[in-house]
Amino acid sequence: MLHRTDSFWSRSVMKTRHLPVRHLATPLLLSLLAACGGGGANPSANLVSAPVNGTQAGGAGGNGSKPGVAPGTNGTGSAGSGQAGGHQPGSSNPAGNGSQPGAGTSGNHGGSSDSPRERVSWAGCKLNYFRGGPAVADRTGSDPNQTRQWYLTNTGSLPGFSTDGMVAGEDLRVQGAWDQGMRGEGIRIAVIDDALEVTHEDLRANVVAGSHNYRRLSPNAKTIAGHADYPMPCTEDNDHGTQVGGVIAARDGNGIGVSGVAPRAGLVGFNALANSLTEDALDALVRDIDRNHVYNNSWGAADIGHFFAPDNKAAFDSTLNDGLSKGRDGLGVIYTFAAGNGAFDGDYSSMDGTVSARGIVTVCATNAAGTRAPYSERGPNLTVCAPSADLSRTLGIEGAPTLPDVSTTALQNQYTDSFNGTSAATPMVSGVVALMLQANPKLTWRDVPLILARSARQVDAKSSGWRSHNSPIVEGQPGAYDTLRYHHDYGFGVVNADAAVKLSRNWQSVGGSSTQKQCGPFTTRVNAPIPEADAVATNPVRKSQAEAFRKALIEAGNRIDYNQAAANGLTSTVSVPESCQITHIEHIEVTLTASNADGSDEHPSAGDLHITLQSPLGSVSTLSVPHPCQLPTDNGSMQIGPCQGLQNYPFGVRRHLEEPVAQGSNRNWTLSATDRVAGETGRLKDWSITFYGR
């Protein structure tokens, strides 16, 4: 969902945040392809089947074998439907009125039936899915592929994999939450994505009524393509949502596959990305907010450097407000969003206005060694990270260790060891939130990020980027969760399921939407030039200089001290009036417009700018860093071009969580801006700041 209306910006809408490994050989295209890949790795690569007793479901053509099955895990399959993607009888046991996928049994791996089957996928799709067939007994037993799920329990090694650099304990600490009796029972999680294979053998026991199919015969058509209640994959590229669903809530103890973080939570699927329409995404974000608890969004704007505000921000904000104020009987639904995968090309999470809006839990990614995954975008909007793939070797980083990706469910009753990106980290946090809500169903949408931040686990402790703030949960009563630590790489740290559940149990709620205070917006008209200083490159860029220019800006962004205000530039201060009595900030929105030198148009190269916000406590949020941008050429390739979109752009800020608006008599919030690239200049026209909290 983007701010611009021309064809380039429109087609960049709603991209999944999983990095398709087959595309990563071209660094310049990484951020676009990472966002546009639609679902991930080559379907025939790194797929594994559960080593179970019995038969395996037939694959393409019904030959009984699965492409890319890991050595030693092949089963003997019975015939499938004889069509590519044919699904086995007995793969769904609908509940209720029989028209919706429901909480079914943990289905068989093979067998056949002569009973009539109803097609639930669109006839024009390459993959075919059916419902119906005989009910089968539940399987029991351990999940054989759980040993591959290092992100659940990291022992420092992985059987059958050649890995180095793994660090024991760099995981979700989920076993501690499970030991407290939390598995997600009674909590419903909606997967907003490209598709969800609700008939998957390791998902369908947790699929509950309420999924919705958004696929249409054409973008403007009113007719749904396929069954209205089955958001099924259409092609092999539509595997992203099914991988997300497995991370959240693959069924545990059924003798097959993997285990989700919340393995007894309910799942529904909304394939709202099928048509890349804003209206579908907005509808999905508030569909059944009276029944669903968590909405997982492993997607966002294309990771190509521009400032992408939501298309029709008023409608987007209104939609979120409905979910926050009306969902769960006024407690509010929980929205998780992926921070983005473009860091390797200089992209920055706060430049995607969709994932930094008020009420969103923005999720970054670490690796199995406990450091930032090199693609995971930094920002002042991050809440917590979760462990995901590293991909340093794939990205061409010399000397990097070989670290594992994420194991989860894949299409056609298969499993993959190659899920990655902030797409994989986000459903882990969604699963942890489900465990928290089971522990305390009265938690509001405001409570959840506070608990996540206070209970998060600090990683990369030797990094100089950490800053701390002490904010007692109960005044005068020191506690274990009083100190909040923030890092622009990691947000408040890595999500800690065990600690989050413990803190949730006796948490005193701060209330929902009706009790949250708002101060502002406080607007300042500046209309002054942004000075050039400490230039790292020069505009305009000749084609022969594009790669050197790109590298110079990325290196400049990496070298910045994110806890220092932008130096030698323009400063502008807002003094917050005494009528604003927020003592605990929960969210800040800074809206900013930069123009060209004469003020007649937008800034000619907004990626040149280093922009920061400093609080009365002295803490700094880096809103934007020098970075390159990409634009499409006539032949469809990408090239370096000027960064656009910094007009009335909303920066969402989480970094000042639990700080006061004022420190004694100091009520000044200072914006600083410096142009770090020589040659094209502009002005700061105006900016405003709005505070939310209590």
Identify the residue ranges that each predicted region occupies.
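Extracellular S/T/G-rich loop segment that most often corresponds to the catalytic His/Ser-adjacent loop
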Residues: D193, T354-Q438, K442
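C-terminal motif of bacterial Sec signal peptides marking the signal peptidase cleavage site
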Residues: L33-A35
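Ser/Thr-rich, Pro/Gly/Ala-heavy low-complexity intrinsically disordered linkers and tails
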Residues: A41-S115
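Loop and turn regions of beta-sandwich accessory domains that flank beta-strands and are enriched
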Residues: W507-R694
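Bacterial N-terminal signal peptides that target proteins for export
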Residues: D6-A25
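C-terminal subdomain of the subtilisin-like protease fold in secreted/lumenal serine endopeptidases
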Residues: A123, N292-S298, G332-V333, G359-I360, ...
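Solvent-exposed loop/turn segments at secondary-structure junctions
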Residues: D194-V198, D252-N254, L273-S276, G300-I304, ...
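Active-site core segment of subtilase-fold serine proteases
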Residues: S115-A265, L273, A281-A314, D322, ...
